[in-house]
Amino acid sequence: MVRTEVEIGRGLTIKNPVMTASGTYGYGTEYKDFIDIDRLGAIVVKGTTLHHREGNAYPRMAETPSGMLNAVGLQNKGVHYFVEHIYPVIKDYRTEMIVNVSGSTLDDYAETSRIINELEHIRAIELNISCPNVKQGGMAYGVTCEGAASVVKAVRRAYDKTLIVKLSPNVTDITEIARAVESEGADAISMVNTFLGMAIDAEKRRPILSTTTGGLSGPCIKPIALRMVWQTAKVVQVPIIGMGGIASAADAIEFLLAGATAVQVGCYNFVDPAAASYIVDGIEDYLRRHGISDVKELIGSLVIEHN
């Protein structure tokens, strides 16, 4: 028997370190006919904003070599719809349900978080700080220490449960952003969000996405994401939830070895709806094969030999 429980901040323990990434798993209900979703450690539901958002115009997704671009634009029906129609359906799932929160202003973030704070069976939120600050020329909150810290500070006043902050990789030094959000009360850090990229239709001489650029995810980003997790784990004390190109148990284990406490499976859910479940099984098999009794023994156990 191996132990797979991990703590992801403020005393919140999940049954295993495998989570699904926001925007790739809907509300979990969409996948319940494919797998036993209660087998997962946690499900991070799609991005939720204070008000209804239509999202960006089509086309807003594009396949790329070893990955995909997306520019969905946080399409959702708003937090009040979530409370009235989605929460009653998902609140009794036996896996942890985490709400991804996005906003255009600090007040938006704080108010959405305050509303979710009242939901008994939602014990954690994940802040998407890659959103543009509409009051500061559209620059994403998460690309400066000051911007990232301001979101966490505003939300921390309104939210008293586990607060996970999702970091943008589109920065010079992600460890500085990580330290900034930790100092303002983040209980955990999830990383990394998508990389800014673009795709072009050479025949038409036009960008493929309606927004020109979009977020790049998939196996192509894994080596960079892994490096960022490894660097960040050395400078923060809070748990790290690693993501970026995870498609197998071996991928997930690499992130744990680099210092992540848990992982999120993202766009590979589109390839195989049961991927996250297989990864849970694969981690357990790895622990048994290596005679490891507790998954926590893997966290940050990477051996680096210097010649």
Curated annotation (Swiss-Prot):
The active site is at residue 131. Its EC number is 1.3.1.14. Disulfide bonds: none annotated. Pathway: Pyrimidine metabolism; UMP biosynthesis via de novo pathway; orotate from (S)-dihydroorotate (NAD(+) route): step 1/1. CDD domains: DHOD_1B_like. Its cofactor is FMN. NCBIfam families: PRK07259.1, pyrD_sub1_fam. Belongs to the dihydroorotate dehydrogenase family. Type 1 subfamily. This is Dihydroorotate dehydrogenase B (NAD(+)), catalytic subunit.
